[in-house]
Amino acid sequence: MVIVKKISAIEVLDSRGNPTIKTKVELCDGSIGEAIVPSGASTGKREALELRDGGEAFGGKGVLKAIKNVNSMIAEEICGKDAYNQKAIDDAMLALDGTDNYSRIGANAVLGVSMAVARAAANSLNIPLYRYLGGANACTLPVPMFNIINGGAHANNSVDFQEFMIMPFGFSKFSNALRAATEVYQTLKKILNDLGHSTAVGDEGGFAPNLKDNEEPIKIIMEAIKKAGYKPGEQIKLALDVASSELYDGKTYQIEGKKLTSEELVDRYVKLCDKYPIFSIEDGLSEDDWDGWKILSEKLGDKIQLVGDDLFVTNEKILKEGIEKGIANAILIKPNQIGSVSQTMQTVRLAQRNGYRCVMSHRSGESEDSFIADFAVALNTGEIKTGATSRSERNAKYNRLLEIELETSEFLGDKI
């Protein structure tokens, strides 16, 4: 047992210049854990709720109210508890809030404490965070999903789909996969320059050119893979995050200036998958369109990975409903969608028990905190999504995975 001695939080800035919370936990043996909470741009309706200040400062996005909750009521509740009992600490914060979405004290307040406690406990034992959270079975480095062209809510351009990604499968080591993806990214930059497109980047480091439709980014990425010296489909596959809830009006989807039904949009996906080596589609339909998701799952569920992000919001109860209804076959894992380390772990375990793949994920508003890199290895998620290799808050996660590779070199690669 090691007792939580002190908890404190301050306001810092995330990668978009918005305020967020940095939390520090000190244990009675002198061990310290710190964590910075991320924040999303496109968010699911059923996510745990961040607490923001409102008012004029930072356009209403300040987090001083949440920080006050950390420094007062959460600190009073958690100090004196055993840091090694993560679930008891997380359960205590959930009970303190009294709601199922942290609308009282703020999911951002809770998550910062939860992450920092885990770090402090790992430091107390002098073991890596991934080993502390995952035990002896934490041994596999995830296949990264690199977001290299941005559209939708992550960029100010004409592309509807939010993310166009590459996944380097055909490599024996994580470091080799990272190198390949980086070379494709740099090649893509040159191609876009040669075509006269902007190489300005979006929130997650991907380029955000004004392209004519949602297929053109795929064509350009295919060209970049080949020009970089790699084989599409064999070594590097494609993935899409459509973020279709942003395109849905309750009945139809606004795609390239046209209104499409769920069936018509699914047919588009089928054609794209027939034409290109697409491994994964995330949020292919709206979180409110479960009938459409059923159609998508029936048509493509046995061929590609269908990831629920806004659909499941890392929520164990919602995922259970999806499993029962045969919706999707994978889940995006974002700790701040659900609010604590323990709740995140419970959702991952439910998914894995039922054959759903898990993708550990960043948010568009990130920081230098690399917690999710360790978390992906700890939970053997097999995949991680944390942006392009061009912004330091994204590279912090990749660099941490490179460090972990020195200790546990198994890479999922083409075994996924």
Curated annotation (Swiss-Prot):
One CC-aspect GO term: cell surface
GO molecular function per UniProt: magnesium ion binding; phosphopyruvate hydratase activity
EC numbers on record: 4.2.1.11
Cofactor: Mg(2+)
Binding site residues for Mg(2+): 241, 282, 309
Active site residues per record: 204, 334
Cofactor comment text: Binds a second Mg(2+) ion via substrate during catalysis.
Annotated InterPro entries: Enolase, Enolase-like_C_sf, Enolase-like_N, Enolase_C, Enolase_CS, Enolase_N
Any matching Pfam family: Enolase_N
GO-annotated biological processes: glycolytic process
Cellular localisation: Cytoplasm; Secreted; Cell surface
Pathway: Carbohydrate degradation; glycolysis; pyruvate from D-glyceraldehyde 3-phosphate: step 4/5
Keywords, alphabetical: Cytoplasm, Glycolysis, Lyase, Magnesium, Metal-binding, Secreted
Primary site of residence: cytoplasm
Uppermost EC category: lyase
Catalytic activity: (2R)-2-phosphoglycerate = phosphoenolpyruvate + H2O
Record-listed (2R)-2-phosphoglycerate binding positions: 162, 334, 363-364, 385
Family membership: Belongs to the enolase family.
Database matches in HAMAP family: Enolase
Function: Catalyzes the reversible conversion of 2-phosphoglycerate (2-PG) into phosphoenolpyruvate (PEP). It is essential for the degradation of carbohydrates via glycolysis.
NCBIfam families to which the protein is assigned, alphabetical: eno
Protein's UniProt name: Enolase
Organism: Campylobacter fetus subsp. fetus (strain 82-40)
Gene: eno
